[in-house]
Swiss-Prot record:
Record family assignment: Belongs to the UreD family.
Molecular function GO terms recorded: nickel cation binding
Protein's UniProt keywords contain Nuclease: no
Any one Gene Ontology cellular component term annotated for this protein: cytoplasm
Cited PANTHER family: UREASE ACCESSORY PROTEIN D
Subcellular location: Cytoplasm
Organism whose genome encodes this protein: Prochlorococcus marinus (strain MIT 9312)
Cystine pairings recorded for this chain: none
UniProt name for this protein: Urease accessory protein UreD
Principal location listed in the UniProt entry: cytoplasm
Swiss-Prot/TrEMBL keywords: Chaperone, Cytoplasm, Nickel insertion
Amino acid sequence: MIKTSWEGNCFLNFFNNKASIGNVDKTIFKSKSTSPYKLLKSTHDEEGRCILPVLHTAGGLVGGDLLQFEVNLEKNSKVLLTTSSAQKVYGSVGRSKINPKGSFSKQKNYIKILDNSHLEYLPQETIIFANGLYDQKFKVFISENSSFLFTDLIRLGRSSSGESIESGVFRSKLEIIRNNDLYDDWEYVDQIELSKASYEAKSGMDYMPVFGSLIWVCEKDFSKLKINNLVGNIKKFFKESDNHLSIGILENGISVRFLGSSSQEARKCFFCIWKQIRSVCGFCEPKYQGVWPLQDSMNY
């Protein structure tokens, strides 16, 4: 039987290279991947942080596709992972007489962050085309003195073409587990399902097609005062925005939600929050990445 779906794998192992840039240690990596994954050229910022864009060469996902993405940060690593384009999930429902209900395309993500390491995973948005079915799972293990920043931006349908999600479904589960010497402690769990019903519900998305999450889990001993000041600054920024934004304080970090009509506005909001997080951590100011949409760069 001829297979018509992708089964792609990507493994990335980042580690600190003592051969430094001046007086700054540089994070480098080893990788192993299969199609449709392709790694673009990595660069480094002034803190030695490895900046790596990942490309999905197939141009999108269809029902039955299975991707596995595994990331490991060794001790004393700093990494910014992103993607070079939006992830497109094409329609599956009603496309096949054999399986008229369609089948989900799936992505499983496994991330491990060891001592004194910091991962920023900022992929571009996922676009669920009409009748697209997508299920993503993230399992993140993080040490007590490390941090993890993650953004997830979802667009339901191509609203510029008058398209909605129709019978499509987006599912996501994020689990963040804190490692210590004695036991593993659940840090954060987030489970989301978006469909036409939630898109149309007044108490849901209320016909606004763009939904975003920003999750930042910091070191266990990070200053609570700094987190409170960060939240205060972000709330001031919210007052200047016409979008629906909310923020919650986690035990160690923050959770931000975005709801609106513009992916560009969502990216702008998350970029501004990212700058605030970098500042409160004492890291260098982030820069707009060249693989991100050109029109956005004029606004930052």
